[in-house]
């Protein structure tokens, strides 16, 4: 109680601040805990490194850190910030190709100047690390949870706040490719491997009387322009092993869209690519989420999309739909078993502060020689699972 009281008192900000100076000053005092960085390094050295070769692509992956300006010892809070600091610190001395975050950096429930401060500090940590990085947008990252809880009638984040604090820095790196300045699809290459990043929070920022038409926290989707860009990238993907990452799951086990808009269409693109088809793809919608596009995947050689990897659900699960593995990773954010919103998966882990179950993270090794995608978990995560590519 004392810790929480001091934290709430500390994070009091002036309304005029774009980023809370007090938040920024406090966050800069956070340091990686040696026990955790050593633990992450040991997991890599023992389990991952024996599988690393010159042709592999090796990723350090976190998702759903839900950073929040409270020093909670049992739920979302500053622990999410620490997990990123510690994972990136460990990877500075490891043969990792990229540091990846699958979205929901923040919980989105703090005052906007505090949430912006959390985003800025976290991205500076990624920028100062020794590895290139990519951070995807999650459905909490536009701070709509704060708007909902405070019943305010105006959007707490402006149109370009998230882009300027996060996405812009993704694309400042030469390793991260995109088709055009406005494209929401990114990709990285290494040898015969191509990794594509999709934005499952591709929601138009439209204000009605100062309030958002769409609540980014509740609405997930992919719009026509992003689908067109994905098609363009795939049409030029020749003889590659392709793995796709996003924040939210695209489809259910039954094949129905798990997004509010167009998750099933993206799955159809994947299967059409694997089948080397050409044709037209459209839905029954008009307006913001209407889609009517053409594609031609007949000249892509032996390229195949094998796996789609995401977070969002705060548990682990994998299922195969039409030959493509859909893999859901657990949240890094601490979820103590006594909290009502804690998922059953995390309750079983009985996650505790200052124990290895506090965090959850992954190393993903894509090996074209063995034709395997191997996932090595640590903390509250499955230790090993592998899939064909």
Predicted regions span which residues?
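N-terminal active-site segment of His-dependent metallophosphoesterases
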Residues: 9-113
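A short C-terminal boundary segment appended to hydrolase-like catalytic domains
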Residues: 16, 21-24, 28-34, 39-44, ...
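Extended active-site neighborhood of metal-dependent phosphoesterases/phosphodiesterases
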Residues: 39-47, 110-229, 265-276, 301, ...
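Active-site glycine-centered loops adjacent to acidic/histidine catalytic or metal-binding residues
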Residues: 64, 103-104, 138-139, 247, ...
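Short active-site segment of divalent metal-dependent hydrolases/proteases
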Residues: 67, 106-107, 141, 250, ...
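Extracytoplasmic/periplasmic, Sec-exported soluble proteins
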Residues: 72, 76-79, 83, 114, ...
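His/acidic metal-ligating clusters that form di-metal
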Residues: 86-98, 194-196, 208-325
């Amino acid at each position: 109680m004392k810790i929480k009281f001091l934290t709430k008192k500390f994070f009091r900000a002036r309304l005029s601040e774009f980023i809370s100076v007090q938040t920024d000053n406090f966050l800069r005092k956070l340091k990686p805990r040696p026990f955790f960085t050593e633990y992450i390094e040991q997991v890599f050295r023992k389990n991952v490194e024996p599988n690393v070769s010159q042709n592999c692509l090796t990723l350090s992956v976190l998702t759903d850190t839900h950073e929040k300006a409270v020093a909670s010892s049992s739920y979302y809070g500053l622990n999410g910030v620490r997990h990123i600091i510690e994972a990136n610190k460990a990877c500075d001395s490891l043969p990792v190709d990229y540091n990846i975050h699958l979205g929901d950096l923040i919980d989105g429930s703090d005052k906007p100047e505090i949430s912006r401060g959390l985003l800025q500090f976290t991205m500076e940590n990624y920028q100062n690390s020794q590895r290139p990085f990519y951070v995807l947008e999650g459905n909490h990252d536009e701070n709509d949870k704060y708007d909902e809880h405070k019943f305010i009638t105006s959007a707490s984040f402006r149109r370009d706040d998230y882009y300027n604090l996060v996405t812009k820095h993704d694309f400042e790196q030469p390793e991260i490719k995109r088709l055009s300045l406005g494209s929401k699809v990114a990709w990285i290459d290494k040898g015969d491997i191509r990794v594509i990043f999709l934005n499952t929070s591709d929601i138009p920022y439209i204000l009605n009387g100062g309030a958002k038409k769409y609540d980014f926290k509740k609405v997930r989707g992919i719009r026509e322009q992003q689908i067109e860009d994905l098609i363009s990238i795939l049409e030029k993907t020749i003889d590659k092993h392709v793995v796709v990452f996003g924040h939210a799951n695209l489809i259910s086990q039954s094949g129905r869209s798990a997004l509010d808009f167009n998750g099933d269409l993206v799955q159809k693109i994947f299967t059409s690519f694997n089948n080397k088809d050409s044709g037209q793809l459209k839905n029954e919608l008009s307006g913001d989420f209407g889609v009517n596009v053409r594609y031609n995947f007949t000249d892509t050689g032996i390229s195949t999309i094998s796996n789609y990897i995401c977070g969002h659900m705060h548990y682990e699960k994998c299922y195969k739909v039409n030959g493509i593995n859909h893999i859901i990773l657990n949240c890094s954010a601490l979820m103590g078993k006594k909290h009502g919103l804690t998922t059953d998966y995390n309750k079983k882990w009985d996650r505790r502060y200052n124990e290895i179950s506090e965090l959850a993270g992954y190393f993903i090794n894509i090996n074209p020689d063995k034709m395997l995608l191997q996932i090595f978990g640590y903390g509250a995560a499955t230790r090993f699972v592998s899939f064909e590519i």
